[in-house]
């Protein structure tokens, strides 16, 4: 079976448990049993040797762990006499035996399995009489590495997790990164470093602060040591098969952390990489504090707030340069830039080799935030320190549960001389092919050939580089690369003070419009109830009629002009990059007919209140409230 068939087979367990478990609880059954079945298949060939080793050294050694790990060939083992076949052979005692089987795993693997809280699920399945049927279904799928290799197994886990989230429509900001996008990001992060990586005895570290099921870390390592593979075929050779790559990560979701950790225990026999995957919130509890990494890669949650971490984040920000968030804090509704700053804080010092970073985010970090806001200050920090190497705009409809536009930021603190002080913008929105079958919202993918095109565009580093793009059946030569100095993206917010013309004329046309003005309508409204409210409304209607009569007697053709000031943001001429909305012009009651330009007054100052136009008969006016209402600003 291919990975899609395996996912469909495992997801079919939902048909058995739908009357016992709510739709949102399917993962409590399917995910831990998928992990257990994978572990069962992995350990099958060395099961007898582990049991023999335990019998031989029991009572002779205080700590059997080393011998048992050696016997199993992995960093974990299971000393229980059960496997899936033997569990099903003793159906009456299945629940108790399954618990004993889980307890037989080594301590490091038990820690992983405990994150699933599976013991309660066992009890619920047993009480419903479903435990045997469910376990039998998992026994019928072969997940041995000889039949399902590690990359395929990773895809299966991600597909299952995607289905769980899709079924619930939960965690909308968390988007599991498709493999084609991960391959592109790994290539962008490693681009230009091939000679460095090929050095004999090369040792590098890779870090993902929101690693999910670990796909980005594992694919990056495969690019270096195993090459790019698909269906067993090598599409691109490895950069350096002998390089030593250490993986580090952190994940806040317990189930995906458990999946990542168990997968790495299988892929890396010493268990070193699995031990480096920490559990907890990266923003409030940095489990890798003090470490610096050579390569950093991430897909942080889009538009997800950081309220839960607010206290710790603000405390960290107050530490200034000693903390991770010194440049600024974004708005609390979106924490993408916090993960970005966290990655910058974990970059290796340029004097010690520096780092390269690839992070994919939506458009919010590019465009959100007014001048002086947290987002603007973070962007300013990145550009003034010349950290941004390139921005790549990706096609839409690449992700499983969103079709939004995304951008890959390529960042480094060791730019080559030709790139210093410059940023390359690449339009890769047309570099896609349609998928044969959609997966959720994912209808497009980036093939390896298009990935190579993007890498070549970056390597050529050519301003105005073009490609022939086919769109709607028409071919057109399009500019897909532009290069700008970092200063091009700067702007200043300035205050422009100038007269704001307010014209007062008592013409029949304007008097007729009074009934539509809220200020005039409010004269006959009251917040009081009963007789008191009715009295105020009646008095207001009298004022309205008298005001109308007064205006009709106003000398025809005469007018008065008042002035005010307004503030707007103005970028430096020719230096606009990210658009910041200008404040709209204030609208006034009894405004001038279109096209008229009353004389401009020089009486302006910042913050001046909108003046009330003078009136020759104002002193005799019995209704100053009415005049003030329809001659002041909204």
Task: Tell what function each PLM region has.
Residues 9, 16, 25-38, 254, ...:
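Conserved Class I SAM-dependent methyltransferase catalytic core
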Residues 135-136, 239-242, 273-278, 317-323, ...:
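Short acidic (Asp/Glu) and glycine-rich catalytic loops that position anionic groups and cofactors
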Residues 20, 307-316, 321-335, 364-374, ...:
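Short, contiguous acidic/charged loop-to-helix segments that flank catalytic cores in large enzymes
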Residues 225, 265, 269, 301, ...:
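Hydrophobic alpha-helix feature that most strongly marks membrane-spanning transmembrane helices
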Residues 175-298, 303-315, 323, 337, ...:
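Conserved S-adenosyl-L-methionine
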Residues 1-194, 268, 272, 276-282, ...:
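Non-catalytic, mostly N-terminal accessory regions of nucleic-acid modification and defense proteins
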Residues 378, 383-388, 398-468, 511, ...:
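C-terminal, active-site-flanking charged/polar segments
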Residues 124, 146, 210, 246-255, ...:
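Hydrophobic alpha-helical scaffolding
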């Amino acid at each position: 079976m291919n990975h899609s068939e395996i996912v469909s087979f495992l997801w079919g367990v939902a048909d058995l448990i739908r009357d016992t478990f709510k739709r949102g609880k399917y993962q409590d059954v399917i995910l831990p049993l998928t992990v257990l079945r994978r572990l069962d298949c992995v350990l099958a060939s060395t099961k007898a040797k582990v049991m023999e080793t335990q019998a031989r050294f029991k009572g002779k050694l205080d700590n059997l762990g080393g011998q048992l790990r050696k016997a199993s060939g992995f960093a974990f083992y299971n000393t229980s006499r059960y496997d899936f076949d033997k569990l099903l052979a003793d159906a009456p005692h299945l629940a108790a035996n399954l618990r004993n089987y889980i307890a037989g795993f080594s301590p490091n693997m038990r820690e992983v399995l405990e994150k699933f809280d599976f013991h309660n699920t066992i009890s619920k399945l047993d009480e419903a009489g479903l435990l045997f049927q469910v376990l039998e279904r998992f026994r019928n799928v072969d997940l041995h590495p000889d039949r399902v290799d590690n990359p395929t197994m990773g895809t299966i886990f991600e597909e299952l997790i995607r289905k769980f989230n899709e079924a619930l429509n939960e965690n909308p900001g968390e988007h599991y990164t498709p493999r084609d996008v991960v391959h592109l990001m790994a290539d962008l992060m490693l681009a230009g470093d091939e000679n460095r990586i090929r050095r004999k005895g090369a040792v590098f570290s890779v870090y993902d602060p929101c690693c999910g099921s670990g796909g980005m870390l594992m694919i990056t390592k495969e690019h270096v040591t195993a090459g790019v593979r698909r269906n067993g075929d090598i599409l691109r050779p490895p950069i350096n098969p002998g390089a030593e790559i250490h993986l580090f990560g952190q994940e806040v979701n317990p189930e995906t952390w458990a999946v990542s950790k168990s997968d790495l225990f299988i892929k890396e026999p010493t268990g070193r990489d699995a031990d480096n995957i920490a559990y907890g919130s990266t923003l409030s509890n940095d489990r890798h504090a003090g470490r610096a990494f050579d390569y950093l890669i991430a897909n942080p949650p889009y538009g997800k707030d950081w309220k839960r971490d607010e206290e710790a984040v603000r405390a960290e920000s107050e530490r200034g340069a000693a903390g991770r968030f010194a440049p600024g804090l974004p708005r609390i509704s979106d924490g993408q830039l916090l993960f970005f700053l966290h990655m910058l804080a974990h970059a290796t010092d340029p004097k010690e080799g520096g780092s390269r970073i690839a992070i994919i985010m939506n458009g919010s970090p590019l465009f959100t935030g007014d001048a002086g806001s947290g987002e603007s200050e973070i962007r300013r920090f990145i550009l003034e320190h010349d950290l941004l190497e390139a921005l790549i705009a990706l096609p839409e409809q690449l992700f499983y549960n969103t079709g939004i536009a995304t951008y890959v930021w390529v960042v480094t603190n060791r730019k080559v001389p030709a790139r210093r002080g410059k940023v390359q913008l690449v339009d890769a929105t047309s570099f896609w092919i349609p998928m044969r079958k959609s997966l959720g919202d994912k209808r497009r993918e980036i093939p390896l050939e298009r990935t190579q095109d993007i890498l070549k565009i970056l390597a050529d580093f050519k301003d105005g580089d073009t490609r022939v793009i086919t769109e709607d059946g028409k071919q057109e030569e399009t500019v897909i690369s532009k290069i700008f100095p970092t200063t091009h993206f700067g702007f200043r917010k300035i205050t422009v003070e100038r007269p704001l013309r307010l014209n007062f004329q008592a013409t029949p046309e304007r008097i007729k419009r009074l009934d539509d003005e809220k200020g005039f309508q409010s004269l006959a409204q009251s917040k009081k109830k009963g007789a008191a409210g009715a009295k105020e409304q009646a008095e207001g209607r009298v004022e309205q009629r008298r005001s109308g009569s007064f205006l009709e007697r106003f000398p025809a053709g005469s007018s008065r002009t008042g002035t005010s000031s307004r503030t707007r943001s103005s970028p430096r001429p020719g230096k606009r990059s990210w658009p910041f909305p200008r404040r709209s012009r204030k609208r006034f009651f009894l405004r001038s007919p279109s096209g008229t330009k009353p004389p401009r007054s020089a009486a302006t100052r910042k913050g001046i209140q909108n003046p009330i136009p003078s009136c020759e008969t104002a002193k005799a006016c019995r209704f100053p409230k009415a005049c003030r209402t329809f001659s002041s600003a909204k």
